[in-house]
Amino acid sequence: MALKHFKPVTPGLRQLVIVDRSGLYKGKPVKTLTEGKSSSGGRNNNGRITVRFRGGGHKQTYRLVDFKRAKRDVSATVERLEYDPNRTAFIALIKYEDGELAYILAPQRLAVGDKVIAGEQVDVKPGNAAPLSNLPVGTIVHNVEMKIGKGGQIARSAGSYAQIVGRDQGYVIVRLNSGEQRLIHGACYATVGAVSNPDHMNTSLGKAGRSRWLGVKPHNRGVTMNPVDHPHGGGEGRTSGGRHPVTPWGKPTKGMKTRSNKATDKFIVTSRHKRKK
């Protein structure tokens, strides 16, 4: 789908670039495949802000997307492509031969009327899901499982994908968009193709209000605050902070590594930081 630019008849339209969604279904989602969703406003169960600059935004209904593709060897037809406010990608409503409906992530080049299937042996075409070990090396995949049967976790946002680059003793080597290469068990399922809406990265919100519709509030810099609020706060007039950049909690920012070592590090074949050197 193409990008839409607008005549600058108002200041908010001057910078606005959005994805043309005219090809998507215009009605409401399937009610049995939706749930209510209450926004947290960045607060935890104690009512304290745990994520700053969140709140407001348009009310959303959660669509129950099938990341597991647990219904195996049953063909399904794509009924329609839909917008989903909870993610950057589009979703596809599929109808199995037995009449059951489900939502899946829509891959690129999936059209209404296409047939999709999940199983051990499937054709390598967009929307079909299979174990990684049964897909040929070089295949572009998305919605990749990290644990058998847990459901896809890798490559789910708009335009993202991973690529199978090799095999090793029951595991499959997968290259991610970040440049990282990981070992993933061959029995983990993945869906063929790249995720839909690749133009999402080229959009421009155009005005602050559009950010507010998404539930994002203004982000304040530390140097504009008072000393009680931030280590960079205070001073007479405008200051540069007077120290190396830190978070509101006093920890160095700008490049300090915060990731702790995990037992699963052994599955990382090539770090995403390797290519930066």
UniProtKB/Swiss-Prot annotation:
Family to which this protein belongs: Belongs to the universal ribosomal protein uL2 family.
**Which Gene3D superfamilies does the protein's record reference?**
2.30.30.30, Nucleic acid-binding proteins, Ribosomal protein L2, domain 3
Disordered: annotated segments:
223-277
Residue ranges annotated as transmembrane are: none
Q: Name one Pfam family in it.
A: Ribosomal_L2_C
Q: Which GO terms describe its molecular function?
A: rRNA binding; structural constituent of ribosome; transferase activity
Identify the domain of life: Bacteria
PROSITE patterns from the UniProt entry: RIBOSOMAL_L2
The terms describing its cellular component in GO are:
large ribosomal subunit
Q: What is this protein called?
A: Large ribosomal subunit protein uL2
**Record note on quaternary structure:** Part of the 50S ribosomal subunit. Forms a bridge to the 30S subunit in the 70S ribosome.
What keywords is this UniProt entry annotated with? Ribonucleoprotein, Ribosomal protein, RNA-binding, rRNA-binding
User: Coiled-coil regions in this chain?
Assistant: none
Question: What role is this protein assigned?
Answer: One of the primary rRNA binding proteins. Required for association of the 30S and 50S subunits to form the 70S ribosome, for tRNA binding and peptide bond formation. It has been suggested to have peptidyltransferase activity; this is somewhat controversial. Makes several contacts with the 16S rRNA in the 70S ribosome.
- Give the species: Azorhizobium caulinodans (strain ATCC 43989 / DSM 5975 / JCM 20966 / LMG 6465 / NBRC 14845 / NCIMB 13405 / ORS 571)
Which GO BP terms sit in this record? Answer: cytoplasmic translation
